[in-house]
Curated annotation (Swiss-Prot):
Enzyme class: translocase
Reactions accelerated catalytically: a plastoquinone + NADH + (n+1) H(+)(in) = a plastoquinol + NAD(+) + n H(+)(out); a plastoquinone + NADPH + (n+1) H(+)(in) = a plastoquinol + NADP(+) + n H(+)(out)
GO molecular function annotation: 4 iron, 4 sulfur cluster binding; iron ion binding; NADH dehydrogenase (ubiquinone) activity; quinone binding
Entry protein name: NAD(P)H-quinone oxidoreductase subunit I, chloroplastic
Cofactor field: [4Fe-4S] cluster
Pfam families noted in UniProt: Fer4
Assigned EC number: 7.1.1.-
Membrane topology field: Peripheral membrane protein
Length: 166
């Protein structure tokens, strides 16, 4: 008879403990009920990126002196720089410049160490394609200026996300 009483007491304690845990979870749920939603409706609403956002790289062909500093500081030796030495003026002439964004880690070293500032980071982050070979951008594609999110009238921009209260 004694073991049956202890089992009944354990059952009662477990029931009380379970009810307490459910109550704690329910209180957390209720505390989040009066907060604003954090999610945004992505294709129709977009956040304004910060000033130092590291998006797609913009390249200015005329400023580049083909020094290949960007290739040396890149952790994965990504930029492909093709140049030809002009013997009469003893300078390099840039022939081709390309970056494969399928491999790029967007670290920003190439932009930071470029002596002529011909590379810059843009706010463009929508680079997804169905074919990975389309992510290999040449100097013409890199020179294209991105359309700003603010200028697109079909998208509602959200300047700052509501702060999350902890």
């Amino acid at each position: 008879m004694f073991p049956m009483v202890t089992e009944f007491m354990n059952y009662g304690q477990q029931t009380v403990r379970a009810a307490r845990y459910i109550g704690q979870g329910f209180m957390i749920t209720l505390s989040h009920a009066n907060r604003l939603p954090v999610t945004i409706q992505y294709p129709y609403e977009k956040l304004i990126t910060s000033e130092r956002f590291r998006g797609r790289i913009h390249f200015e062909f005329d400023k580049c002196i083909a020094c290949e500093v960007c290739v040396r500081v890149c952790p994965i030796d990504l930029p492909v720089v093709d140049w030809k030495l002009e013997t009469d003026i003893r300078k390099k002439r840039l022939l081709n410049y390309s970056i494969d964004f399928g491999i790029c880690i967007f670290c920003g070293n190439c932009v930071e160490y470029c002596p002529t500032n011909c590379l810059s980071m843009t706010e463009e982050y929508e680079l997804s394609t169905y074919d990975r070979h389309e992510l290999n951008y040449n100097q013409i594609a890199l020179g294209r200026l991105p359309m700003s999110i603010i200028d697109d009238y079909t998208i509602r921009t959200i300047f700052n996300l509501p702060e999350i209260k902890t």
